[in-house]
Amino acid sequence: MSLEEKEMKYRISDIARELQVSPQEVLHFVKQEGAKVASTSSMVKSDMRELILGHFSDEKRLVDQTRKIREEKRQRLTRLEEQSRKTYEKEQQLKDSIAVFPEPGPVLKKDHVHEEPEKPAIVISESEPEVEPEVEPEQPAAAQEAEEAVPTEAVSVPEPVEQERVVPAPEKPEAEKPVPEQSSTMKAQASPEMQVTYEKPKNIGGLTVLGSIDVRSALDRGSESDRKKKNRKKRFKEQADELKGEFENAGKAEGDKKPAKSGEAKTKAPKKAAGTTGSAAEDTTSSKKKKGGKKKKPAVDEKVISQNIRSTISGMDDSSGGSGSRQKFRKMRKIEREKELEAAEAVKEAERSIVRVTEFATAHELADLMGITAKEIIQRCFTLGKFVTINQRLDKETIELVALEFGFEAEFVSEVEATEVFEVHDDSEDLEIRPPVVTIMGHVDHGKTSLLDYIRSSNVVAGESGGITQHIGAYEVTLDNGRSITFLDTPGHEAFTAMRARGAQVTDIVILVVAADDSVMPQTIEAINHSKAANVPIVVAINKIDKPEANPEKIRAQLSEAGVLVEDWGGEYQCQEISAKQGMGMHELMEKVLMEAEIRELKANFSREANSRGIIVESELDKGKGVISTVLVQRGFLKVGDPFVAGNTMGRVRALMDERGRRIKEAGPSQPVRVLGFEDLPQSGDEFVVMPTDKEAREIAQKRQIIRREHEFRRSTRVKLDSIARQIKEGLMKELSVIIKADTDGSIQALADGLMKIHNEEVKVQIIHQGVGQITETDVLLAAASDAIIIGFRVRPNVNAKRLAEKEDLDVRFYSVIYHVIEEIEQALEGMLSPELHEESLGSLEIRQVFRVPKIGNVGGCYMLEGKIFRDSKVRLLREGVQIYDGVLDSLKRFKDDVKEVDAGYECGLNLKGYGDIKVGDIVEAYRIVEKKRKL
């Protein structure tokens, strides 16, 4: 045994799986052998593995036998498949070798037989014959049927010559073994150099032609029907096999019997009279006819044979002219289809190996996703040392481990992705040009809303508190040329980062507004990063160029440093100088926006039957109307009465309003609309999807709520447990508890993000509760119980809540500008900070003489070198530069009088509290401690 084998280790569970025995049995045996193992996941060395295999040799032998049987079955199936494939290839070769017959001659009637029919003789010509255009019409019926049944190459019939002799028929080719012997044309085909000639000797009995059947007309009638034609093609192979078997049976039955038709006797004559003359062959034929006249005909259904012949000829006529190339094309198509199916199967197999699951899924849910039973999940968890039940929720690590055990890869998704409604695939013919969605971004007070005011010919700024945009405004504007543009006006304050990110996700084009009298600010850089991350084109608008201090070139230079090189400087970003107040350059800016939209070819499905989809831009709670959300429609038409699901909530559209509050009946793609009818407040950025029924919408919303609730519960529990040690360690961490109530969901998110950034190692903001709507009694009671302050952003308390807050003496603050909220919370947190202590030097003294005073101790006679010393000052005694005392004065005197202070240049006497070892030459420094307010 090599060193590598000795070092190899094996997992007990893998060995048990190989032997197909219980892992617990293997673990029990290993422990009996004295090995120290903890569980079935423990590793053992190769020598222990050999002991296990030897102990469970019977089980291993049974497993080996089972595998051997499976292998034999697999090989047998492989051989059968190979034989089937070879048989199919031979049949295809046989079909390819079949050629098309010339137009068949008239078929003879067999009802009325003349006593002395004319019998054509078969002779072989050695000289080159002249080719006649047609075969003799008096060809016997039996030979005609045989020729139709077995199509071969067309045979030319030459004129008879003087010297003729009969030769024996050559051996048939191997590929034509199933063809009946009575076909004279097949014998002629076996030797290409020989040509068959039919003679009509006089005074020879045979059949008399009394009529004919028009086979071509019957075939034409059959080919006129497309349905029958397709059915014949499908049955082509089956009919050929059936026809071949019937003729073989007929040939065997006629071997010992007299031929029923004179044509059959003529085909047998050359074989039996080999080397004789034609007359001898004729005598033999006539004698056979006399002997076998009373025998019965072979049991062959002539009607079935005739129908099969016609069907076969019809199928060959349809595929005539390039049948070989058509067969090759079919084979190529079949191979291509097989390759496509294999590729699709490989993709499906790869997709099947990935399990998209939410965190904290139950064992039953995980089993359904992997296509196994929950019992198997529980058993595998048991072998891994985890005890779970069917409805127990598994953590992330357990889900990954169990998925790997069953050959799957776990991919964790959110509750919205896990309950994805349906994927939308619109056909290109259903898509139409839609208006572009343009988001206006930039720094605070750079003129974003003023730009939109000029476009809308309205005054949005007047409606915003402090002239600062604090909501995402969605507006639809129709230009002078009839084109429509949807504008999203985002806040520029740093607290609204999430709002700007949402605006970049749903937009098509970004107008980046930069003030020409200012510079590129941090929020400008942030807007550029949001746009680039969302892969959205940027059109730069340099505003306020009408001001005398405007410097557009400086703005272009700063933008190039930020990665936005405008077209004027050879870049790819369009740029326009404007004045939102005066309207300068506005027309050119709109043209550039429309040109950018045409380049991107923005399209959407305008079908009224398509399920509508959109994005929640903003949400708010109205006292009289309830939850109102601004939805940007992206697909289809949103109509009143449509059931929908949005995030974790659902509802039915009760009313639709435009941005000016006017009621509308429907809203199409790229149109912003205010929707009434939500059960709960959705979050900004949630997807809005119209569902077929209320029941389906409610089921999806409930599933998402359950998953979200479980996530929050598990996460909060884990945070609390993890934070116990941290809280014990920190001990003196101070928190400012707040309750936030605002008018919209976006404002709440902005406030929460801004407040959570205000913290340090000593103080922080703890948001206990946040919600949309007015301040209620519940909020006041919660604030009283948790000793929190209430922040109302653009909302007020109701009468009962106001009375209760006064009774509880709670601090309730109201704001309408986000700046003021953040500033005051910062001040409150700074007041909670411990002040910083600074030392301020007051002066220094030199001890020039030491006096001994009874009951007091040593008193130093000092001279004030600089500064000033006070009675309550702290002092520090230095001897040769080394501090030997730090304390306070016990007394300060000038002559015999106590004084409060002594200035520089004066003498004084002092003694130190609790210290008397003073010497001449020591220096006394006077100082005091000053408290300084700390800043965050």
Curated annotation (Swiss-Prot):
Signal peptide limits: none
Disulfide bonds: none
Stretches with biased composition (Polar residues): 182-194
Annotated region (Disordered), positions in chain: 102-332
Compartments in which it is found: Cytoplasm
Matches recorded under InterPro entries: EF-G-like_DII, IF2_II, IF2_N, P-loop_NTPase, Small_GTP-bd, T_Tr_GTP-bd_dom, TF_IF2_bacterial-like, TIF_IF2
Annotated spans, G3: 489-492
Gene: infB
Biased composition (Low complexity): 151-160, 272-281
Region span, G5: 579-581
Function: One of the essential components for the initiation of protein synthesis. Protects formylmethionyl-tRNA from spontaneous hydrolysis and promotes its binding to the 30S ribosomal subunits. Also involved in the hydrolysis of GTP during the formation of the 70S ribosomal complex.
Coiled coil: none
Pfam families: EF-G_D2, GTP_EFTU, IF-2, IF2_N
Keyword Nucleotide-binding: yes
Domain of life: Bacteria
UniProt name for this protein: Translation initiation factor IF-2
Organism: Prosthecochloris aestuarii (strain DSM 271 / SK 413)
Family designation: Belongs to the TRAFAC class translation factor GTPase superfamily. Classic translation factor GTPase family. IF-2 subfamily.
